[in-house]
Amino acid sequence: VAAPLPRYWTWFDVVSNALGYLPLGVLLALGFLAAFPRRAWLLMATAVALGAALSFILEGLQGFLPTRRPSNIDFVLNTLGTAAGVVVGWGMHRLGVLDALERARTAWLLPHAGAGLVLLAIWPLSLLFPTPVPFGVGHVLDRLQDTVAELLEGTAFAGFVAPSDPVFEPLGGRLEFMAVTTSVFAVCMLAFAVTRRGWHRLLLAPMVLAIGIGVSALSAAITWGPTHAMAWLTPAAEHGLWWAGALALLLAWLPGRLAATLGLMAFAAALMVVNQAPEDPYYADALKIWEQGRFIQFHGLTRWIGWLWPFAAMAVMLRSAAARS
């Protein structure tokens, strides 16, 4: 802690280290205040201390890793992020935000909607890691094929699985349109599968589109720069977004089970198209920036979320479609 401050740092490191611990502070504050509402200041101080202790332990453990170095400025920023989150959580408690959310949950959500809500909350993270086509999460076939071929190399089964061919024909506007339409429509159906029928569903589809566009723009901006934030929005992608939103609004009256069934079909179609997408030079450069550049701390988590998210969503929707009313 008393070591000199690091000579080299970036604003990305400052913001990410502070924001990364903000949700922890919010959750700790809300949990403590819900259990012991009369000891607010003591609980808030305890929450900040717990966040600081967690950061201190994790920074200390980095000293045992060959490629990592502990940083006192990271510890300070993590602690400040926790403190900011505690203040936000205290404000939410004072304003009765939790009570309002509980009433909205009862009015909007179906029973046992927890897994679907978690997946909807994680979906923006899956879009952060570069994809070969907009909203094209679940692009795992090439990696899986290469991994299996590498594992079988030198065995009697070496010829059964060949490494993926890096040369592909361009995906084409029609397939890109189909990939975007089915991917976004499937997320809308996941949202419908966990909510009750009503006017609020008419808000969910625009919210899904707005969040998806915003996170995709953020991913492009932090990869290529702010001037290229909307470079991913090709005419095919734009038309796909319009069609996905329009179809979702037309089907907002569907029962949850039927929405889950349609979403399951849409996810299957999206995965089939996305895994045909080529790894063009721009996509390869984006991967290199994330895997070897300043986002190296985050690429592993976001990559795995992007790979596995649609399959987890399909499992949840399969359970919803098969459940009894």
Regions found by a protein language model. Name each.
Residues 76-79:
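Long, hydrophobic, well-ordered secondary-structure blocks that form the structural core
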Residues 1-67, 72, 83-325:
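Bulky hydrophobic segments
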